Amino acid sequence: MAIVLRTVDFSETSLIVTLLTKDLGRISALAKGARRLKGPFEGSLDLLSVCAITLIDKPGDTLDLLTESKLRRRFRGAQRSLERLHAGYYIAEMLRLLVDDDDPHRELFDMTLSAMGMIDGEGHVAKTLLAFDAQCLRLLGHSPATQRCTVCGRDAERSRRRASFSLVGGGVVCENCRPSQSHLMTASWDALDALRELASEPELPPSTIDADTDNPSQPPSTAFPIGRLFPAMTPAIYRDLRGLLNRTLESLVGQTPRMQPFLPDKLDSL
């Protein structure tokens, strides 16, 4: 199974396709004939389409060859609203920036399917993107520290209304260590509490523990119920947390994602 993250024209008839796969991680492959009107890929290579693929592994720096792709689920966010379309584009961009080539993360794949299902359906866009970002950080080993100081390791006291947060250290900094640190921002403790919930591991109902996400008829949230992570929050907490995640991700990838300005600026974004 694979999710289409990007396509780039290679020739008059072919594409270079970037895919997030469940078993191989992020890969790039050459899809010969994909630009033909009646090509061999049956319209399965649209952005964020979920497809079953067949690859020929090429040695060295040569691109793998994508020989077959069968559409399993098409992303239809654009038919719902511009905001849902932008959310889908943001997910694709962040996966390209955060995930290394040939580094499989099966749980990340399941989480992405779940987030896309929420955006493609009736899910809350703003909260889904918060959970997506927080889970990307957790699953890729960058989950922010929200309770213990990233410098000394002690519990950070909540003596101030807002906590100091290190973009370099990836978490809170206590009052004793704060003067020696740079690249700090502040965040409310309520926002950090919400982040901790969003970055937690979701509990699976017993009936879905062995769910098979390769089954296209199965709801995309079955294997990773991302909607269970949504905490209660006020508009002020949302703005604070959205800003914290934006700055954290910028620091991690070394740039401002192109789709970041199009993220929901209000909590009530559906």
Curated annotation (Swiss-Prot):
Region entry Disordered, spans: 202-221
Pfam families attached to this UniProt entry: RecO_C, RecO_N
Intrachain disulfide bonds: none
A single BP term in Gene Ontology: DNA recombination
Gene3D superfamilies: Nucleic acid-binding proteins, Recombination protein O, C-terminal domain
InterPro entries according to UniProt: ARFGAP/RecO, DNA_rep/recomb_RecO_N, NA-bd_OB-fold, RecO, RecO_C
Keywords, comma-separated and alphabetical: DNA damage, DNA recombination, DNA repair
Gene Ontology CC terms: bacterial nucleoid
UniProt similarity note: Belongs to the RecO family.
UniProt function note: Involved in DNA repair and RecF pathway recombination.
Protein name: DNA repair protein RecO
Organism: Rhodopirellula baltica (strain DSM 10527 / NCIMB 13988 / SH1)
